[in-house]
Amino acid sequence: MEILCMKTMKWIPWDNVLATGHARLDADHMILVDLFNQLATSIMERKGKVDCVNLLDKIVRHAKAHFEFEQQLMAEHRYPNTEQHTAEHVRLIAQAIKYIAKIEADSPGSHIPVIHFPEDWLTFHILAADRELADFLSTTDATAA
């Protein structure tokens, strides 16, 4: 999957590869993808640290709400991998907060790891963990939640 499309200033084009089949999860993921793309534009257009920090903060706030919803689903449906999935949520939020702190401190090269953040999120969370959760939920009639 091509993460950064320089011509369109998009890191992540939304397509069926990213869809889990769960309406609410997919809607939340679309918002995250849009926020990541806004962050890509901010970095590419060198809009500055305030803009990057504001966008990362929006990503964190949306992700926290999304993760709370996922954790509620996991509890309601007794998802067997809840502990591992929740640990991944904690790791992703901590990673984003670390990037915010580095950017605010004007650490040299602080924007570089941020560029790879969406790839990590996609590869290790949406495409793997969230898809596994959605597959589990589809067997418990929870797809429309």
Name each region found by the language model.
Residues 2-145:
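Small-residue-biased structural context
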